[in-house]
Design a protein with these regions (language model features):
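Catalytic cores of TIM-barrel enzymes
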Residues: 1-177
Length: 177
């Protein structure tokens, strides 16, 4: 409960006992440094979570596996090296006309990091999305509405699982830099 209390205090600027942070390590780093990295993580459980001496250093899944992956929206993710982060190299909505026929996925895949801004750039490509933001064509609002409605559906699906005795914090990761 102390971690939750510190998070609430930090969000409300009420002087938490610690600044709440978490550290994520790429699978490639675990694969390379193995037990040495596990020793570092064990030394700092407040940053890395509980000690895990049974870690499978070679277990890599999803878009961390080298190759091309297509997500529920039709974005093509490319990864050159297993364990590293992949990047979107194929944007399924390259033109404004394509926005007019875009349908959100029927499949519910949750709320990945890149909840709104990154999803928009994944769909359109960074340059095209920046032009859309600058010019504000009608297709921009159409795209925003499609992604927003999908995200609302994902959050609605998640809410029943958050009801319980312990207070929960829900956050949505995104990135503009």
């Amino acid at each position: 409960m102390a971690i939750h209390d510190d998070r609430m205090k930090a969000m409300l600027f009420e002087g938490p006992s610690q600044i709440p942070v978490s550290v994520g390590i790429l699978p490639a780093a675990w694969r390379l440094h193995r037990e040495k990295l596990n020793d570092v993580a064990a030394k700092y459980p407040s940053l890395f979570g509980p000690e895990n001496r049974d870690r499978d250093f070679d277990a890599v899944g999803g878009t961390y596996v080298a190759g091309e992956h297509i997500d529920a929206w039709g974005c093509v993710w490319s990864n050159l090296c297993t364990g590293m982060e992949s990047i979107v190299t194929g944007h399924p909505v390259p033109t404004r006309d394509d926005v007019r026929t875009l349908k959100a996925p029927e499949k519910d895949v949750g709320t990945p990091h890149g909840f709104m801004f990154l999803r928009l750039t994944d769909l359109r490509g960074f340059e095209e999305m920046m032009i859309d933001f600058a010019e504000e064509p009608p297709e921009l609002q159409m795209l925003l509405d499609i992604v927003r409605d999908y995200n609302v559906r994902q959050v609605s699906n998640m809410l029943p699982g958050l009801i319980g005795a312990e207070p929960r914090i829900v956050y949505f990761g995104d990135d503009l830099g």
